[in-house]
């Protein structure tokens, strides 16, 4: 785990099973930030190919994924990312330099197996499509994905992010 906003002393970690660094995950390394590949190296997980990545980093997910090599991404069996700022999809620069490259990078080796729109932020109409500002996507590595591919939304375990707002699908 890594999070620049949390002090490790406040966590009840099980030594040998959990690893934590007080840094932001980003597309570069400095005293406060690190790349995904640096985190894997620091956690001594470079030989693993069965990792789970859950990323909710408020917009830094794009730079983090763009700067991560294909071989590093393939160390993860499952990737769960909350994508922010999707209202910018109407901006060509964001679409072509951030969103599309990230999706291409991930979909090269992963299948999207679940999509959950966040109902706590507004919906935008972009080219006739209703798009949430924030969307959580779950990806499963293709070489591990032997299950039946079914399309159904919502999933029975989906819950609202904001119980006071209507669910969006």
Range-by-range predicted roles:
Residues 1-34, 42, 48-49, 87:
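SAM cofactor-binding core of SAM-dependent methyltransferases
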Residues 17, 39-169:
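Conserved acidic-Pro-Pro-aromatic motif
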